[in-house]
Amino acid sequence: MREWEAFISEEERKIYEKAGYKGKEKFGVNPALLIIDVITGFTGTKPMPVMDAIDEFPTSCGQVAWDALPKIQQLLHACRDAEVPVIYSTSDPDFKAAFGNATKRGVDATDFEKLAVQFPEMIKPNDDEFIVRKARASAFFGTHLITYLVRKNIDCL
């Protein structure tokens, strides 16, 4: 059993199986890695318990984000080594004026907010990697992501 499967009840497994969600999905032939919102606003600036981390950024996940970073970094390096395109998403405080904020915390784009949308050093994008800058929670709404995927013929993320 894979580690995450321990969190799925037997009843849920039966539901998934009966509904036809069993086995592995096949990947496409031209995949890309999409790293969604792994930014300072969700990781914080350093490892710390979540109750302390939210004093720095109310959206921070605290220590669990820092625990995930080495795993994300490992996947990132594997994709780069295999020449799989890497795409990042981040919020863009400057877009909020046009599209509105993703939450009810309307704040002007301050230096603090600009720090929040930066990527942690250990998974920082290379210069040739695509960054989706967004005003809303979705990496697709009001962004160029679909255009990028179609132009690059990417068929799975």
Model-derived features with residue positions:
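Internal catalytic-core helix/loop-beta-alpha segment
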Residues: 113-156
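Active-site acidic carboxylates
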Residues: 1-126
